[in-house]
Structure formats: structure tokens, C-alpha cells
């Protein structure tokens, strides 16, 4: 899980979702997991 100021899609499997007011990226590749903070 990377914590970044700006979350971006890295590959075509990445999805940007908002969960409890937190922007996250979920992906089939675990390296692409990100959270805005």
C-alpha cells in the first residue's frame, strides 16, 4: 500500500474507488495498491 498525495491508475486493471471518504486504487497487481493521505 502506497500513501500518496495524488493517486493515479498505473495499469488498465487499476480502479479508483472512494471508501469512507478515502480515495483508493485497487488492482489485480498488489504493487499498484494506493491510498490518498
Swiss-Prot record:
InterPro entries: Ribosomal_bL36 (IPR000473), Ribosomal_bL36_sp (IPR035977). The keyword Nucleus does not apply. GO terms for molecular function: structural constituent of ribosome. One of its GO terms (cellular component) is ribonucleoprotein complex. GO terms for biological process: translation. Keywords: Ribonucleoprotein, Ribosomal protein. Pfam families: Ribosomal_L36. Belongs to the bacterial ribosomal protein bL36 family. NCBIfam families: rpmJ_bact. This is Large ribosomal subunit protein bL36. It comes from Idiomarina loihiensis (strain ATCC BAA-735 / DSM 15497 / L2-TR). The gene is rpmJ.
